[in-house]
Amino acid sequence: MYCWGCGVKLYINGKIHDSKLFKKIFVQPASGDAGIAYGTAIVSFIKNTKLKKNFESRNFYLGSKFNPNEIKKSLLKYRKKIHFTFEKDIAKKAAKLISDGNILGWFQGAAEFGPRALGNRSIISKPFPFSMKNYVNKNVKFREPFRPFAPAVLENFAKDYFYLTQESQHMLIATKVKNNKKKFIPATVHVDSSCRVQTVNRNINAKFFDLINNFYKITKIPVVLNTSFNVKGQPIMNDPDDAILCFLKYKIDYLAIGDFLLKKK
């Protein structure tokens, strides 16, 4: 386990992973100053409870979250500009929209602790064709065309697609995609065939897992393109109002907030 600023150096993490010097590496996803408070809290907990056994924290969805009433209050505020429906299975509906080629804003549960969007404050699309990468960079994120996106993959399929020997739940290991899988996920593969992989485990993020799993049932590809819910120069969307305003202003086709699905009028 290691952290601080070096912890977000994906290619260094990938080299350490590939070296096989360790059975497993763990990088705290809020590496840097933000993680100091988290680390001191753990040290205090260990000292005060006399905990002997090492433990690993796997849930880093520690930020703000909103209940259905709070979400609906925001929806009603913008009802002249949006249509919204309550979906019994938002993950299944979202997967179908993505498979049809739509760009989806995905705002769920508690916000991520750290700089990466890990499936609760994300913009999501299908990982193919290659032109999807260019479209999202140019029309949604307003970034340079070479900038890569992350493949979010069902954890049990990760070794089929990537040269990974462990989970990568916090999108902090750069690894290569296998040659026979590149054609299925070209929008998430960097020019050097590397990927910033996020493995998704149902026990950690059930709704995001269900979205990808439903996408897999439709397309037979267990991977979606995942990028942070923001545009260049802006912070990640933190509350429903932020998400709705971003959705209305930019080329995002649909927005899922909790179990509500939004479309522009």
Feature map (PLM): residue ranges:
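Short glycine-rich phosphate-binding loop at a beta-alpha junction
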Residues: 1-5
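Flexible beta->alpha loop and helix N-cap segments adjacent to enzyme active/binding sites
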Residues: 9-265
